[in-house]
Amino acid sequence: MTTRIDTKFAELKAEGRPALVTYFMGGDPDLETALKVMKALPKAGADVIELGMPFSDPMADGPAIQAAGLRALNAGQTLAKTLYMAAEFRKEDDTTPIVMMGYYNLIYIYGVERFLTDAKASGVDGLIVVDLPSEMDAELCIPAMKAGINFIRLTTPTTDDKRLPKVLHNSSGFVYYVSMNGITGAAIADTAKVGEAVRHIKKSTDLPICVGFGVKTPEQAAAIATHADGVVVGTAIVNAIAGELDEKGKAKGDPVAAATRLVHALAESVRATRLEAAQ
């Protein structure tokens, strides 16, 4: 089984550059605007899209992403509408990988089999489910793999050598290294330690390693890019969108343009870093 994620990372490896993985919240601040953001991301330089599934109790998310989820839910966003976004995106873009990211409760209520069927039909390539450990692979991970959808695991600085093989077992697509403990949007980790961690994980897997949590600026993204196969940016993009909204969460500026400007700057920085390192 070769997915769009596999194809994308193979292409990037051949080009000698890391991926820019961009996260935003589905339905934030509303369905129409969020879909415009999603369609604009690849044109701005995003290589992989992480599509957030808004949830009322997002335990791993910091204030910015929690607020984005709340705005989306208040605007009527549902899991079905988030899948609709993926399907609409696929009508114009059949190559950029889509990874849906969120919490298991949403999928469980929707129905695992129904969700996987609809996700595959909508053009979803991978899942990141932050509250589903490897001990529960039978719940979603293995069915997802059988459906042709990558299941992407999170590793952290506290994932020790005993735990790492369990985390990597049944992982596919890429490995998401959370560069610090805590919630999304925290301060960036020491890049030297990140590099050491990535090298350590690579001893146990051939999968690409993408690093996220705390990456906010093009300079930070470039620093991480020297050590990883991909850089994940989420909170900064969510904040760029939020900066164009009024106190009620309605657009007062141009959220799409704000997100696009940031992603373009991030993409230029990430690509230039690896090119300089390769010369």
UniProtKB/Swiss-Prot annotation:
GO cellular component, one term: cytosol
Reaction catalysis annotation: (1S,2R)-1-C-(indol-3-yl)glycerol 3-phosphate + L-serine = D-glyceraldehyde 3-phosphate + L-tryptophan + H2O
EC annotation from Swiss-Prot or TrEMBL: 4.2.1.20
Annotated metabolic or biological route of this protein: Amino-acid biosynthesis; L-tryptophan biosynthesis; L-tryptophan from chorismate: step 5/5
Pfam family, any one: Trp_syntA
PROSITE patterns from the UniProt entry: TRP_SYNTHASE_ALPHA (PS00167)
Keywords: Amino-acid biosynthesis, Aromatic amino acid biosynthesis, Lyase, Tryptophan biosynthesis
List of catalytic residues: 50 (proton acceptor), 61 (proton acceptor)
GO molecular function: tryptophan synthase activity
Top enzyme category: lyase
Taxonomy, superkingdom: Bacteria
Record-linked HAMAP family: Trp_synth_alpha
Subunit structure as annotated in this protein's UniProt entry: Tetramer of two alpha and two beta chains.
Family membership: Belongs to the TrpA family.
Task performed by this protein: The alpha subunit is responsible for the aldol cleavage of indoleglycerol phosphate to indole and glyceraldehyde 3-phosphate.
Name the UniProt record assigns to this protein: Tryptophan synthase alpha chain
Provenance organism: Brucella melitensis biotype 1 (strain ATCC 23456 / CCUG 17765 / NCTC 10094 / 16M)
